[in-house]
Amino acid sequence: MEPKTSAAGTVQHLDHFVLPVMQPERAEKFYVEVLGGKVLRKMNDASVNRTFIKIGQNHIGLFSQTKAVLPKPETLDSFPRYGFVVSGDDFQKIRLKLHVADGLARKIEKRGIATGCGADEGIAFADSEGNLVELFRGEGDAPARLHHLHFDTLDLEESIRFYTDILRLTLLERDKGLAVIGVPSRQSIVLHEVAELSPVTTTTYRGRHFAFHVRDEDFHAIVERLHRAGIDERDDHGEREGRRPEQLGTYFKEPSGFRLQITNEDSATFAAHAR
């Protein structure tokens, strides 16, 4: 057991996530050719294909599925949804490519708390595999970055308590079954209270998780809070292949069942070691 710490136990930023894919080559083609990503590493074996792709400041993982199926989306308003912000030039290029790809896509009309993204121009679409993605036009020519997540929840109060008490995140806004949880580095998690969780939310997909970068001392403080709350955390929830000895990381579930990770490695460090 780790010694008790006086650290605040806060996260630094939403660093990366892993998405389920049905056809790895098709998914890689989409994220490279349409979203402008760069392949960092491929790790394949008989049970799973893993592709890690750099998108601006962050990276995502694309993990093949042998049992669970990702359904074709019927709407762009389901859950979960994954949001990026890109430069104005990149936004225009990607929007044109999405129309050429002839996928499910539309302009985001909502503003403010419903998007978690203020008044920036945006577009919602489904990737080649059926994952729901949102893209917003950022200011200036800053590189692309992860910006927000949309999660559904059966109990908004419980979810708010989890993110504010366990991860020490901030409740920014709340209105009519919606809550925006602020993540440092100008990121957010938008929580939507629903009567029934999305099938994609409740399905267990191999490797799917959402990772937050933390400092070493904050890692141990968060683990202490998880233990006090009776929340199970363990590293063998995840994929250990490629883990460096000095890397800290553990996995646990939030109230809707999404698997979260805290780790002291960030996307920049991962990219340096990935090749």
Residue map of PLM features:
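Acidic (E/D-rich), amphipathic helical modules within compact regulatory domains
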Residues: 42-52, 56, 85, 108, ...
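Residues that act as N-cap/strand-start positions at coil-to-secondary-structure junctions
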Residues: 47, 78, 117-119, 175, ...
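Vicinal oxygen chelate
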Residues: 2-9, 13-22, 51-54, 71-143, 224-275, ...
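Core segments of cupin and vicinal oxygen chelate
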Residues: 9, 19-66, 151-195
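N-terminal beta-strand motif that seeds the catalytic metal site of vicinal oxygen chelate
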Residues: 1-25, 81-82, 136-160, 187, ...
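Structured core of small recognition/catalytic domains
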Residues: 145-150, 157-262, 266-273
